[in-house]
Amino acid sequence: MMRFCQFLGMVMLATIGVRATPLCASETPGEIRPAKVEITGRGFEILEMRAKTVAFSMRPYVWTDVPAGIEGLLYTQMAGGGTATVHLKAKEAGRVFVAVAASQMLDLKEKGWMLPMPDRSNTFTYNDVHQTMMVILSRQVGEGEELDVLQLGWTGTIVLLPSDP
C-alpha cells in the first residue's frame, strides 16, 4: 500500500507539473485566430458561429455558451450523426482550430492536436438534453500542409475558420 501511495503521489506531482506549463500565445483565452485554409470534402456547410444558431443541419439543437473568441468565425456545420469528410490545405502557416464533443477530445490529442486546459474561453455547448460540451483543440500547420480532419462521434469534428477566408 505504501508503494502505491508513493506512486500516486509521483503521478499527481507529474500531472501538476505538466498542467503548470504555460500555453503558447495562440492558445491563450481569446486568442483563437485560425490560419487561412482551403477546405474540401462532403457532408458539411460553411456557416457563421453564433450563439442560438442551429448547430447541426439534421437537428434543431442550437449553440449555447459560445465564447467571444469564436463568435463570428466561420465553421463546418455537420449533419450530426452523419459521415462527413473534411480535407484542408493551409494557405499560410499558423494554427488550425477544431471543436469536438468533450468525450472525444483525447482521441484527437492522440493524433497530435493540442489540448489546452478547458475553460469557458475554449468550450461551448449545444442544447441537447445533456448540454453536450464542445472543446476547442488546435494544431500547428505549415503553408501548403494538407490534413484530413478525423470525424469523431455523433457531432463530428468541426473546423473553425477565419471570418475572412
Where are these regions (language model features)?
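C-terminal segment of classical bacterial N-terminal signal peptides
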Residues: 15-22
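Non-catalytic, beta-strand-enriched accessory regions in extracellular/secretory proteins
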Residues: 71-87, 132-137
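Extracellular and analogous surface-interaction loops
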Residues: 84-95, 137-144
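Bacterial N-terminal signal peptides that target proteins for export
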Residues: 1-9
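Extended, low-complexity, turn-rich repeat/linker tracts enriched in Gly/Pro/Ser/Thr and Asp/Glu
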Residues: 102-108
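Polybasic, proline/glycine-rich intrinsically disordered low-complexity segments
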Residues: 28-50, 108-165
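Glycan-recognition and processing domains
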Residues: 24-80
